[in-house]
Amino acid sequence: MTSLTLALDAMGGDHGPHVTVPAALRALKSHSSLKIILVGDKTEIDVYLHQAEQELLSRIQVIHTDEVVSMSDRPVHALRTRKNSSMRLSIELVRDGRAAACVSAGNTGALMAMAKVLLKTLPGVDRPALVSCLPSVTQKPVYLLDLGANISCDSETLFQFAVMGSVLCEAVDKKSRPKVALLNVGTEEIKGNDQVQQAAQILQNTEQVNYTGFIEGDEIYSGNVDVIVCDGFVGNITLKTSEGIAKLLVHQLKRGLTQGFFVRFLAKLIAPRIQAVLSQMNPDHYNGASLIGLRGIVVKSHGNADEAAYLQAISLAVTEAQRRLPEMIKDRLESILLDINN
């Protein structure tokens, strides 16, 4: 298999190298053709590399910088002043062709701003979108976009999101003609604001997108569709609400299973099944949001991700790079525009 190089913002997130470096080593063990460039403070990074296997170390490069984008940095400020930060240098490695993708758990706004300026959008894409997957009752992932990169969107932007989300689902899950829906306040054709209504009309006339109509919030986790499209304001609130509900359910379940001797006894008997259910409800199980629509691959990890969750984000970046996601999106958009013009 052809070797693949990823750039990791080793300093990003709440835990920095304490999480990013061990996760990188685990990724290297899982992917024999993978190489990783760790960008950050070499002294801090080396603490977690000194006991690593020599074969793994041979596939790691460290680029030193002691500048970091803080979680409190405003996007414009970070873009103008953090020019030697671990985040920016990681993205520049993708821009310069030295890495196929980059992963960061750092400041989301700064990451999106830097990625858009440094990598540029694909032809036919007005704005990049942030997309991640959610669990469903059918146990297949459901992709939701936009998650906050664009607070307000016109109909053309929503249409582009639908195309990009469809291609992402095809690339990552190898699913043929994934079902795409627009998130709305009702399923009737008359429901929704002008932007959603107009986007629906465009999608209905686009054969290359398997558009199924509107979907309401209570159907997000049904598994009836594969891709759900909305603006970033709605998407971000939906995602954060989902994560909050998941944490509440996990808390309530754990609390309920510790009350009373008989309940605790039963809990021990079914512990493996309970653990499996809790794992499916854990947001970290789906860690990794992709910033799609750019000329390069950028994956955003949760800032508080642990080692296993960060590994999920790395694995997602590997998959997208192997499938050449930006090229797939570019080709699909060109094909659709050609159909429209003909």
From Swiss-Prot:
It catalyses: a fatty acyl-[ACP] + phosphate = an acyl phosphate + holo-[ACP]. Keywords: Cytoplasm, Lipid biosynthesis, Lipid metabolism, Phospholipid biosynthesis, Phospholipid metabolism, Transferase. InterPro entries: FA_synthesis, Phospholipid_synth_PlsX-like. Pathway: Lipid metabolism; phospholipid metabolism. GO terms for molecular function: phosphate:acyl-[acyl carrier protein] acyltransferase activity. GO terms for biological process: fatty acid biosynthetic process; phospholipid biosynthetic process. Disulfide bonds: none annotated. Homodimer. Probably interacts with PlsY. Belongs to the PlsX family. This is Phosphate acyltransferase. It comes from Shewanella oneidensis (strain ATCC 700550 / JCM 31522 / CIP 106686 / LMG 19005 / NCIMB 14063 / MR-1).
